[in-house]
Structures are given as C-alpha cells and as structure tokens.
Amino acid sequence: MQCPYCQHTNSRVLESRSSEGGQSIRRRRECLNCKHRFTTYERIEFVPITVIKHDGKKESFDASKLLRGMVRACEKTGISHQRLETIVDDIEAYLQQRPQREVTTHEIGQLVLKYLREENEVAYIRFASVYGRFKGIKDFVETLDQLQEETISSPMSQWSKSSTRDRDQSQTSPCLSLTHNGSENSR
C-alpha cells in the first residue's frame, strides 16, 4: 500500500477490524519509510447494475436517486428516513444477488411498491402515481379500488376484522399477535 505522505510502497498493518456491518475491513497502517500512520479500507466491489429506463436508455443503478423518489412519496406518512434507507438497501442487495446485471425501471418500481404496500397505503398510492405515470383521476380510482380489493381479500384483514370480536369474547393474552405470514408470534 502506497503511503499518502511519502509515496513509499512498503507499509505494515498495525490493526485490522471489520466495519460497516462486515461489508468492509478497516486497516491501520504504518509506513516503513517515514513512520507516518494512515488508515485504509477494503470493500467489496459490486458489479454495477444497469437500469433500463422506459425510453430504452441505460444508466447505472443509483440508490440515492431511488431513495429521493421514495422520500418524496413518503413525506408526512410517518415512515422514518432510516426505514426508507433500509428498504433501498434491501432492494439493492436483492438486485446484486441476481445473476442478471440489468434491471428495468418497471422491476424496480414493482419492488418499491411491494415494500410500500406493507408500510403505508398513502405512500404506496403516491409512489404508484409517479411510477405508473397516472394521467388522471381514473388512474387513481382504479389503483385505489385494486388496493381496497386486495386489502379486503387478504388473510390479515379477515383476521383483524374478527380479532377484535374474538378478543372480547375470549381470555387470550393481548400479547399474542399474528405475523404477516399468518403464524402466531408473541411480542
């Protein structure tokens, strides 16, 4: 490793640590020539993901651009910025694990909608309106109707409608709840 002070190429590692949740290694080094100490980081270099836009143009995947779009859709919905960053990280990790190095904006939009559907219906509609390029009220109404139909027919909504009534009639512990996959989970 080249010393940033004297440009000498020999240094010794004094200390190594895992950082950024195991995604990088931090190394403390000392130059063997000038004795200055400096820090280096070793990170995994991912193969870039190429995004194919609606018009066919291609550009590199930009997680910060995706985050900005989600932040705009989620303003005043109560979803924390940290949660949005986690969602973007999850989407990026999913895309990195795929063997395909190209992804369409449609696929990315579907992934975002899947997450936002679980987080907040208002954020879901806002994002869908931009991503889906809504042209008028009819597009909003169709999406709202579809969202309402999915909510009514989902197992969770059926459980939540009957759970209040059942809880009043039984002696079940209020700490027992259902997770998204329908299995019991105690908090």
UniProtKB/Swiss-Prot annotation:
Q: Name one Pfam family in it.
A: ATP-cone
InterPro entries to which the protein is assigned, alphabetical: ATP-cone_dom, NrdR-like_N, RNR_NrdR-like
The segments annotated as unnamed zinc fingers are 3-34
Could you tell me the Gene Ontology terms of the biological process aspect for this record?
negative regulation of DNA-templated transcription
Is Glycoprotein among the key words of this record?
Answer: no
Query: How many cofactors are bound and how?
Result: Binds 1 zinc ion.
MF (Gene Ontology): ATP binding; DNA binding; zinc ion binding
Job description of the protein:
Negatively regulates transcription of bacterial ribonucleotide reductase nrd genes and operons by binding to NrdR-boxes.
HAMAP family the UniProt entry points to: NrdR
Return the protein name.
Transcriptional repressor NrdR
